[in-house]
Amino acid sequence: MTNFEKIIAQNRIKTNAVLATYCVIFAFIGLLVDVIRINANDLGIALFKLMTFQIFPTITMIMFLVAFVVIVVCIQNFSSIMLSGDGYKLIDTSKVLSSKENQIHRLLLELLEEANLHFEPKLYIINAPYMNAFASGWNESNSLIALTSALIERLDRDELKAVIAHELSHIRHNDIRLTMCVGILSNIMLLVANFSVYFFMGNRKNSGANLARMILWVLQIILPFLTLLLQMYLSRTREYMADSGAAFLMHDNKPMIRALQKISNDYTNNDYKEIDKNSTRSAAYLFNAEMFSTHPSIKNRIQSLRKRVI
């Protein structure tokens, strides 16, 4: 097994772990609401009976159904969600392309040939004044890479190729699944927790139901921090891997370093917070300027790249 195959395998394990974690949290929230619903006197006994189906866990089953439906819907529509909010154009090779569009497509084909990859992501240009890029798609067959028009205009050929190589590495490592699962399911989970607290309380007097209510209140407070930590752990790891993947494909770490520096300087000199408010897409961007970003700092990414022996 090659180094990149190991990375892909590790990311698959992480993806499954993330999905399992969310399913467990969904189930736990559902079980707590079921305890309140049946007005249980003993929390432990009630949880055992619900988990062994001695009492049917109605709310828990609804939670699992919601989780399943959300995942399926997101798989089918994730690319359109990522592209929403801005004017974007597909680089369609069956039509006449501009010189810049031709250049981007040629760079992608070069990388695919050099890496011996047998799939071709769709290429999109997003009409935006900020410099950024992202990849999307559940797997290689429905993948895409999107670059902003500002990025295309301000980077040189090698820097553009390095950015495309970075996004291509995300696709190779199955990182997009992590972005999808963590970004969207985090929001759904928080909504479920809030919904449970405000709509399933009722006037319960038994101790088990009251304890379940207290746990739900605590979860409502800590879940935002838990999901943020989970996003940061997974996303920062995959950004380092994608940077290394770009350097590996380019046989040179300098173009990726220059691209990161230019993008970082662009965000330092301009305020783009009010322009792009797609939170799902921001988690997948090559660069994220927020203080509590899921991405590692540019300084740390450049230091990591400089340690990369080509």
UniProtKB/Swiss-Prot annotation:
InterPro entries: HtpX_protease, Pept_M48_protease_HtpX, Peptidase_M48. Pfam families: Peptidase_M48 (PF01435). The keyword Nucleotide-binding does not apply. Its main location: membrane. The chain crosses the membrane at residues 16-36, 55-75, 182-202, 214-234. Keywords: Cell inner membrane, Cell membrane, Hydrolase, Membrane, Metal-binding, Metalloprotease, Protease, Transmembrane, Transmembrane helix, Zinc. This is Protease HtpX homolog. Binds 1 zinc ion per subunit. The keyword Iron does not apply. Belongs to the peptidase M48B family. It comes from Helicobacter pylori (strain ATCC 700392 / 26695) (Campylobacter pylori). Zn(2+) binds at residues 166, 170, 239. It is a multi-pass membrane protein. GO terms for cellular component: plasma membrane. GO terms for biological process: proteolysis. Its EC number is 3.4.24.-.
